[in-house]
């Protein structure tokens, strides 16, 4: 709790909380080269905890927007860890993703010489994606994030992959991300996690552009973003791990860690 309270020291946007339970493990902050590395490591850590006897229902992965869920959904599926998405649809069930997959399958049926990234980016553009995210929150931003995550999958394919290979990859991912039939790890936006707690929490994707979100520009908006970071951290009863990745497959620039780390880590 003291770790989260560092975010309140300068602005006082919320009354500092006092922990009522036993002292948990020291918070961890970890940087990764790529989003895939980040999510694979988080999935492996979660599987290790479950293998040690921690209930899956006592573990959560939190992120700023729904569009960030695809990479961790895939990593957990690959690790054989059941999960449930709180307050939102699973990635491959979203309307825009279903539309994109139909278009990708149609493109794969008539092979061309286009590189996979070009072919998929053209499909995503036809569905509303662009190189720059919408300036405001809401449905359009969520749709953009989902399509952006779909496009990012192309970066994981071998250089010689075709659009047909990409269609097969998407089919395999859909099959692996089945509905859980038992207690599962929770995936959630920070907003949807308000009021809930878990023994172990992983907060992922903590970069500039996500937390704080791109369209948060005023002092009040940035204060609200800091409050979201605080809310996320305080969802953990015993262990909190905060991670971010430098490499973004759909951007020409590397990402920077969230500015809120400066305040959190000021005293080590």
Model-derived regions: residue spans:
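Helicase P-loop NTPase motor core
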Residues: 1-81, 107-108, 144, 155-156, ...
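Residue-level detector of flexible, active-site-proximal loop/helix-junction positions
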Residues: 33-36, 90, 194
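Residue-level signal for pocket-adjacent positions within structured domains
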Residues: 12, 24, 86-87, 206, ...
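Conserved helicase motor
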Residues: 66, 87-94
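General small-molecule cofactor/ligand-binding pocket signal
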Residues: 28-30, 84-86, 188
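Conserved beta-strand edge residues that scaffold enzyme active sites
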Residues: 63, 90, 246-247
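Short, solvent-exposed loop/turn elements at beta->coil junctions and helix N-caps
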Residues: 18, 88, 190-191
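Conserved helicase C-terminal RecA-like lobe
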Residues: 69-79, 94-267
């Amino acid at each position: 709790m003291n770790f989260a309270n560092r975010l309140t020291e300068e602005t006082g946007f919320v009354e500092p909380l006092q922990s009522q339970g036993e002292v948990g493990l020291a918070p961890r902050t970890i940087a990764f080269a790529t989003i895939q590395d980040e999510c694979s490591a988080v999935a492996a850590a979660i599987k290790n905890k479950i293998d040690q006897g921690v209930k899956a229902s006592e573990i959560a992965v939190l992120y700023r927007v729904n569009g960030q869920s695809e990479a961790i959904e895939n990593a957990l599926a690959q690790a054989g860890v059941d999960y449930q998405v709180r307050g939102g649809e699973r990635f491959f069930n979203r309307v825009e993703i279903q539309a994109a997959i139909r278009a990708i399958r149609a493109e794969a049926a008539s092979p061309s010489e286009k590189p996979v990234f070009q072919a998929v980016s053209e499909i995503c553009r036809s569905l509303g994606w662009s190189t720059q995210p919408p300036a405001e929150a809401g449905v359009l931003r969520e749709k953009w994030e989902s399509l952006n995550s779909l496009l990012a999958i192309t970066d994981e394919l071998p250089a010689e992959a075709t659009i047909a290979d990409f269609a097969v990859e998407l089919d395999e991912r859909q099959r692996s991300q089945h509905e859980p039939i038992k207690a599962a790890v929770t995936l959630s936006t920070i907003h949807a996690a308000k009021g809930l707690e878990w023994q172990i929490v992983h907060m992922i994707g903590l970069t500039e552009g996500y937390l704080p979100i791109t369209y948060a520009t005023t002092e009040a908006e940035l204060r609200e973003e800091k409050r979201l970071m605080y809310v996320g951290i305080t969802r953990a009863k015993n262990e909190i791990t905060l991670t971010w990745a430098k490499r973004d497959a759909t951007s020409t620039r590397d990402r920077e860690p969230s500015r809120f780390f400066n305040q959190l880590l000021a005293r080590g």
